[in-house]
């Protein structure tokens, strides 16, 4: 899409190997990602709304690399399908005993991200199917979805599929795509919303080392 930061079909064109630091798995393969998506595509009738939202949340993570709290904080007003821009300006997170909308973790977290053609189509269909919700990803009450709910569903699905996954891995997949495209570290830092240049640079260094080994 615009500026060619991300492959048009990253799940088809890119081959991603696991990135490991201190023996901890940091990403999943695109085959595993698609297995997870396919599992949510055939829900029970009473789980269709929830499954549709899990799918949208996963694709948003894949194509934008945003944090789970940022994804769940997205409202329709933050998504401009005419200009193909998503504005990241708030998040849903637990504060003490409450789960609520809050400001972002740092100034660098406030950013605007391009929407790929694939994500555009996914969001457009989602909005047409569920026109009544204020939030992009929502629960059965049309309110924001809690991160615990999404995490628990992903954990159950992954256990049944025999794969290890958490939502944060999508950030590594996204940054890996930027690396494979030759995107400058400073640009990748801005897109990922990292407050520290070193955070992004360390990931690029890991990918350099992995490339050398392979």
Label for each model-derived stretch:
Residues 40-51, 64, 113, 129-136, ...:
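Short, basic (Lys/Arg/His-rich) helix/loop patches that form interaction surfaces
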Residues 6-8, 12-68, 72-74, 82:
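Basic, Lys/Arg- and aromatic-enriched nucleic-acid-binding interface segment
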Residues 16, 73-125:
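Conserved tyrosine-mediated DNA breakage-rejoining catalytic core shared by Y-recombinases
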Residues 4, 26-27, 113, 168:
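Helix-turn-helix-type domain boundary/helix-start signal
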Residues 1-10, 83-84, 126-133:
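Proline-centered turn/helix-capping motifs that create local helix->coil transitions or kinks
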Residues 15, 25, 29, 37, ...:
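Residue-level detector of conserved, well-ordered beta-strand and adjacent loop positions
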Residues 12, 36, 97-101, 202, ...:
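DNA/chromatin major-groove-contacting recognition/catalytic segments
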Residues 27, 92, 192-214:
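Catalytic-site neighborhood detector that most strongly recognizes the C-terminal catalytic loop/helix
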